[in-house]
Amino acid sequence: MAKESYKRDKPHVNIGTIGHVDHGKTTLTAAITSVLAKQGLALQRDFGSIDKAPEERERGITISTAHVEYQTKKRHYAHIDCPGHADYIKNMITGAAQMDGAILVVAGTDGPMPQTREHILLARQVNVPALVVFLNKVDIADPELLELVELELRELLTEYNFPGDDIPIIKGSALKALDGDPEGEKAIMELMDAVDEFIPEPVRDVDKPFLMPVEDVFSISGRGTVGTGRIERGRIKINEEVEIVGIKPTRKSVVTGIEMFQKLLDEGQAGDNAGLLLRGVDKTELERGMVIAKPGSIKPHTKFKAEVYILRKEEGGRHTPFFNGYRPQFYFRTTDVTGSVTLPEGVEMVMPGDNLSVEVELIVPIAMDEGLRFAIREGGRTVGAGSVTKIIE
């Protein structure tokens, strides 16, 4: 079947749902598509098709990151349903990194829970610019409790440097909206209005040199290897030369095809989730953690100085200090790389809650510029965050 070309007649915004497990993120995602489908602005996606992660399906826990597409009158949205379960923070970090804004889903019956806090913190760490809150399950929650939940949420958002007093909190029931209840549907439209208004149209990095972090790799028989990911900056056209940078020695290739949402494009640009077909590249030569970039625009490095913040125990961080030579994983863009930490002279140890400058040496090179952000992780758990301040080699 010939793929239809993708139209660009509205601003494109990447958003997603975040929040505690079982608070209704996936139900809300399904409800948004169902309500907008009635206005011809979306294809309806049922809960099961969004929640497709077979090994965990029985327990009703969403693991994989589902991509859904819909429109409002003003915008075109690519929506990610982020996993809520603590074990899947790894996916959350790649997912949240793809957001221009997020809908924080909180059950009115529970109020903020540990993962609510964790996701707000992660949103702050990966620089999600704006949040809108959907207070779910209000049909079965105690009205007096809802007022307290709202106050608590605003305080929590403020604590992590989001504008807690100004963030819209929309009350509703995703399940009722999904069942076609008029009150339920009205809340979804209110939510989409709030998302249109409050989540700023992203300032795209289209004028910078092209760069796309590789999230996944496929091979198409007879055509070659496809790298998928979200284009971080710049534009890419068919037949342009690119470099594949990081982990292994840098190599050149040519982009022979670009597709987005299963539709072919002649050009991809910053903000697009795209698949790039690469000439002469074997599936084994491309892996998650590499970047595809404009030749000469970015170099791989192993040693750098960074400003880091080490999470407090209460934020889900370490319970104990670490010392010179500490070897955690550094999560850059889409992958973890082990590295060793050298503390500044005169610093014996680092306590949870500390903020300091360190030197890091990675075991494999990663494409980096100054200002690149990363998470510091141990066995899949985020224990800190940082930003590259100076490249050494």
Swiss-Prot record:
Residues 136-139 are annotated as: G4. It is found in: Cytoplasm. Mg(2+) binds at residue 26. Its main location: cytoplasm. It comes from the Bacteria. It is an enzyme of class 3 (hydrolase). Residues 60-64 are annotated as: G2. One of its GO terms (cellular component) is cytosol. GTP binds at residues 19-26, 81-85, 136-139. Residues 10-203 form the tr-type G domain. Residues 173-175 are annotated as: G5. Keywords: Cytoplasm, Elongation factor, GTP-binding, Hydrolase, Magnesium, Metal-binding, Nucleotide-binding, Protein biosynthesis. Residues 19-26 are annotated as: G1. It catalyses: GTP + H2O = GDP + phosphate + H(+). Residues 81-84 are annotated as: G3. Its EC number is 3.6.5.3. Pfam families: GTP_EFTU (PF00009), GTP_EFTU_D2 (PF03144), GTP_EFTU_D3 (PF03143). GO terms for molecular function: GTP binding; GTPase activity; translation elongation factor activity. GTP hydrolase that promotes the GTP-dependent binding of aminoacyl-tRNA to the A-site of ribosomes during protein biosynthesis. NCBIfam families: EF-Tu, PRK00049.1, PRK12735.1, PRK12736.1, small_GTP. Belongs to the TRAFAC class translation factor GTPase superfamily. Classic translation factor GTPase family. EF-Tu/EF-1A subfamily. Monomer. This is Elongation factor Tu. It comes from Chlorobium limicola (strain DSM 245 / NBRC 103803 / 6330). The lineage of its organism: Bacteria, Pseudomonadati, Chlorobiota, Chlorobiia, Chlorobiales.
